[in-house]
Amino acid sequence: MGTNVVRVFVILYLLAVCGCIEYDVDDNVHICTHTDVSHINHTSWYYNDKVIALATEDKTSGYISSFIKRVNISLTCLNISSLRYEDSGTYKGVSHLKDGVIVTTTMNISVKANIIDLTGRVRYLTRNYCEVKIRCEITSFALNGSTTPPHMILGTVDKWKYLPFPTDDYRYVGELKRYISGNPYPTESLALEISSTFNRFTIVKNLNDDEFSCYLFSQNYSFHKMLNARHICESEWKALNNNDNASSMPASHNNLANDLSSMMSQLQNDNDDNNDYSAPMNVDNLIMIVLITMLSIILVIIVVIAAISMYKKSKYRHIDN
């Protein structure tokens, strides 16, 4: 009995402080209406004001895909197992009773998780020089019962920045013996940035010098994420080198290649022309020779006929005399 009273007090206190109930990843949550199920005609369930399911006396339909394997929905309850960070939000059940009355049940859920967003962006780049800005942001974290404010560190062994979390946003609750955060998390202030420069031809003796780490420390736990900033520069240098190689070929080389290609194409066309038209040209010559020969024969025949005709006329003229 005493445990239940404390639990109810904790829930009410959290609702009063942050308007939500905090859960850890993989917890189970039950959102239920206290209306007698026999009085309910149907219930519509919402997640962040979007309908996710409709429950009737006969069936429930309309589950969204991310909930299918982890949710159980009925007329009176929405149960989610194995909570994920992205399950955070506002859940609402609107029950339509058989007498026309509408009953609404709402719960704001905040799922605590340790999430670090560590990114690198090139600010300045030449063929030999590269400057990268590394940014680390804590997008979510679980304090796990810590009684001291957390803090974050970004950098390498030799170069780093430190940031304590503001206690105004992360308050210590004596009854709970731990720090709590609001909903949504005021993560806009939980970020660090640091810049680093790299020379392309510098010999790297220790790979850890280029590894940037972002840590979140608390009283009894920590978690971190790592990023090799030099790899970002090397990728940009490789892309720059590829672009240089692609554009370094002189125009004359391109023109020469084009000329050679054109010459080869012309030679091929000439060969094709010769192959296509050499036979017709020989036939024409043969026809001309035949025509000349026939004309010569005809001319000879005409001359012979003329000679015979002249000979006969001469003979007849001699007889008459």
UniProtKB/Swiss-Prot annotation:
It is a single-pass membrane protein. Residues 1-20 form the signal peptide. Induction: Expressed in the early phase of the viral replicative cycle. Glycans are attached at N41, N72, N79, N108, N144, N220, N245. Keywords: Glycoprotein, Host cell membrane, Host membrane, Membrane, Signal, Transmembrane, Transmembrane helix. The chain crosses the membrane at residues 286-306. Its main location: host cell. It is found in: Host cell membrane. One of its GO terms (biological process) is viral process. It holds the Pfam family Pox_I6. It comes from the Viruses. SUPFAM superfamilies: Immunoglobulin (SSF48726). Plays a role in the spread of virus to neighboring cells ex vivo. Belongs to the orthopoxvirus OPG049 family. This is Protein OPG049.
